[in-house]
Curated annotation (Swiss-Prot):
Single biological process term from Gene Ontology: isoleucyl-tRNA aminoacylation
Binding site for L-isoleucyl-5'-AMP: E554
Gene designation per UniProt: ileS
Residues binding ATP, per UniProt: K598
Name of the featured protein: Isoleucine--tRNA ligase
Chain positions of motif 'KMSKS' region: 595-599
Amino acid sequence: MKLKETLNLGQTAFPMRAGLPNKEPQWQEAWDQADIYKKRQALNEGKPAFHLHDGPPYANGNIHVGHALNKISKDIIVRSKSMSGFRAPYVPGWDTHGLPIEQVLAKKGVKRKEMDLAEYLEMCRDYALSQVDKQRDDFKRLGVSADWENPYITLTPDYEADQVRVFGAMADKGYIYRGAKPVYWSWSSESALAEAEIEYHDIDSTSLYYANKVKDGKGILDTDTYIVVWTTTPFTVTASRGLTVGPDMEYVVVAPVGSERKYLLAEVLVDSLAAKFGWENFEIVTHHTGKELNHIVTEHPWDTEVEELVILGDHVTTDSGTGIVHTAPGFGEDDYNVGIANGLDVVVTVDSRGLMMENAGPDFEGQFYDKVTPLVKEKLGDLLLASEVINHSYPFDWRTKKPIIWRAVPQWFASVSKFRQEILDEIEKTNFQPEWGKKRLYNMIRDRGDWVISRQRAWGVPLPIFYAEDGTAIMTKEVTDHVADLFAEYGSIVWWQRDAKDLLPAGYTHPGSPNGLFEKETDIMDVWFDSGSSWNGVMNARENLSYPADLYLEGSDQYRGWFNSSLITSVAVNGHAPYKAVLSQGFVLDGKGEKMSKSLGNTILPSDVEKQFGAEILRLWVTSVDSSNDVRISMDILKQTSEIYRKIRNTLRFLIANTSDFNPKQDAVAYENLGAVDRYMTIKFNQVVDTINKAYAAYDFMAIYKAVVNFVTVDLSAFYLDFAKDVVYIEAANSPERRRMQTVFYDILVKLTKLLTPILPHTAEEIWSYLEHEEEEFVQLAEMPVAQTFSGQEEILEEWSAFMTLRTQAQKALEEARNAKVIGKSLEAHLTIYASQEVKTLLTALNSDIALLMIVSQLTIADEADKPADSVSFEGVAFTVEHAEGEVCERSRRIDPTTRMRSYGVAVCDASAAIIEQYYPEAVAQGFEA
């Protein structure tokens, strides 16, 4: 027998190396086979419900790291709720209609206009479902637990039917109307866009300063006066029908020296504009307020048949331009609003493809709108005062990445203005995390226009609207309910397969169709109406769910997207928000804080992380960052995260190994019988349990990460486990000291594994498989630990906090002695503490082996007054460090005066000799092997 065999060296097959890329899929397969999701739901039957409603990602392509951040965050929340006394089902969803899928098919050579529409839509459907399958596998590979067999998909008949019912309810309340307002128009998509489909980029544009001649000055201005106008969209001059001034702004008429013309412009801009126009000297002739100029008539710069009326508008500023803006009601929201209010014609001179139309004039017809600036300048002639290139933020189609225009076209709208205040009131009642989200969404709703819900595309849910012979739009509840029933049975494809008459209720008549003829709408709904109806198609439709949801969690871009559209439809139909709380996350940037893009080559795919590190590292990274703001990721950052994971794993491995001979039912020691330091660690750990549980409830993942890492690295590795080895390895296997520590080890091991399960489910399950005394087959079926409190714990914590400070000071003294070559390892030390009465009282109160806690072989507590001149002091406490007296015990590795060679061939101290002689008589008789 060898001497080391008398030590209780922990034994475990739990591997030090995780091998996550290979093991994770094995655990996921085991979960699927055991149907863990359903088992967890069954365990929670009858408990309070918690419903996180999944915002549907778009079904196109593999997931990116932003998807991973979002889905992992949701999974952590749902898992923690499921283990904390809540019935928390999680139904994943997918958004499947819209232009991107049409674009994919177009790139594959599919020509929509050359094939049967039903066949084309079936191709769209098949592609979308293939992407759902692909992304489902991607999400499952992340370890996300969900009802994967019963997701919601926006193209399914039942969902489309529920979406139509939302539309029908809004129409029944008078919230749906048709109008020819200017909308965001994408010539590259040939469709209207919603605000959520817009992104902004900085571009260079040519701006023009030009003048309109006064035709009728209404006794205020002479006809030799010209009103100076500024525009950044020269093509819209073709449709200009008015000039807008600020009602309370001050204007002046100036006469440049040497010019026969006089010019009107904002007074505060005179000097800067004069310099721009090359007016070296000028005279101010008259002063006017904007109100005085109202209804003055001017000539269009080149179209002699058009008059442009001066009108008043509060949107005019002097931040740039001239203080006067030309007004084309067909090409801008502000222009439209003031134009309609003043009776201006709404003229549109650009077609759906961005080409100038016949009404723009023969010189412009057929040209692309963005290429006509030189021609506009030519047509302006000497009315053009200046031209310059400016850099400004401009809206782009988020899918095609092409610029868009405002363009008035007949569209269907949801009248947000009719119930705006109700929406704002609901926002006030909703909890937001971070808190600024409330103001952000509030301001968006307050300032937004009515919602353009029609799209001129094919792949989507048709607008369930019919037209009578006299043009009357029909969308009564009777009709929309019938269409919804048809969609539920056949899918929305039936809209394209049947004539209008066959889509209406049997025997339907309408006074506007005396001949019984009807037409059906060919536009589809905005895809944001699709996902924005999910509260009805999912939360309100499934028996195991409830509406409103407890939580919506998405990226901060969804304040103008899903958070927005869901809120509008829910308030419109039911008068309340679809959610009780909204949690938003920032974007994922690269390690330098730059936006990820394929062109920059700085993207990181979840699949790459899974292959190199494992999904657990990505999951741990999610908890390590403050996702309420933009977060950074890189392979270097993930490598650092994997190091933290390794520390956590190896600490838990140590606990597994050193409780391998511990049966909690037989060997556990009651709290009151634990050693002082063991009680301290029990109290300390329960504080961590409390912190983590509260952080889970607050969705504060970073607080969980910090609590776990600090406890594992500081409280366990750097303190408790550091000296505990000298007990659990060296003391007799069944000794009270060892069983006390094992009790604490096992308690921490089991509870910390449960606490980590929502974050590191694969690792937690692997650990659980080694805990043979636990009843649950899988840790996911266990319950979260509840923090305990103990009598007198505050006093105990205070005492140990003071000791930890003293221990830190002692470690500094030991380090100095090590540097001075007095000792090597701390176990070679004889440490003397020159203690005040206060420190002596503290050390006595701890009732502990202080030498053990300091990890020194010998310790002396001396009077503070006796400190020698060569002592070292830290924060008022003096220490001396000498080499310990005696020889090294071959078993405990401590230096001990009682160490001597024994008859059985080893040099050990009396304490080790007693253990050997009691428990290993055969070795005593035969001697130990070398």
